[in-house]
């Protein structure tokens, strides 16, 4: 079933795909799973929806007419929009998926796909969010980890270097959290995938390597 916040409302999913059959399929399937679903056929329609709605996750097709999925993802992240993004790609080349993660997508799924697999990925990404808490309530995770010039605030889900915030995607946050919670421990890809994503490592999945590389560049720069 769909994950809900403490207010009891359903999570809002925005599906962006120029194929109306895929949009309708996902609208029906995700609505049955308890989500509130919005649909957009391109970047302009996405912009109109985001002006009036705050969504919890975007399912974004890579190949769109006009502004493509990579450009949309890059634009949203440049505007400091941290809404989780799962990218759909019919392209078989690894490079397209890797670039998607490098510009800030949280996960990807190749077409054709099983809607149940997309649902599992949606729920996994949404689980990485902070739990909404009552105003004034102490954070359930108020730990701040310091290393070198960095402050990693688990409650605020933020990383600062010498006072300057470095934006993290939900996937990067989950990965950094797993690493700082297990310092000086050898970490296999299998263990890291389980800790950061709650799912088994897939042998041909390069996304772990990409997110580790992004974190390393962020920390070493």
Which sequence ranges carry the predicted segments?
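Non-catalytic signal-transmission and effector/linker regions of two-component phosphorelay proteins
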Residues: 1-14
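His-Asp phosphorelay/catalytic-motif detector in bacterial-type signaling
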Residues: 10, 54-56, 80-84, 202
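Charged docking surfaces used in two-component/phosphorelay signaling
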Residues: 24-32
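Short hydrophobic/Thr-rich beta-strand motif most characteristic of the beta2 strand and flanking loop
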Residues: 34-43, 49
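Hydrophobic alpha-helical motif in two-component signaling modules
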Residues: 50, 59, 70-73
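Active-site beta3 strand of CheY-like receiver
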Residues: 54-59, 64
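Basic, amphipathic DNA-recognition helix from helix-turn-helix-like DNA-binding domains
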Residues: 68, 74, 78-146
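Positively charged, aromatic-enriched patches within helix-turn-helix-type DNA-binding elements
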Residues: 105, 158-221
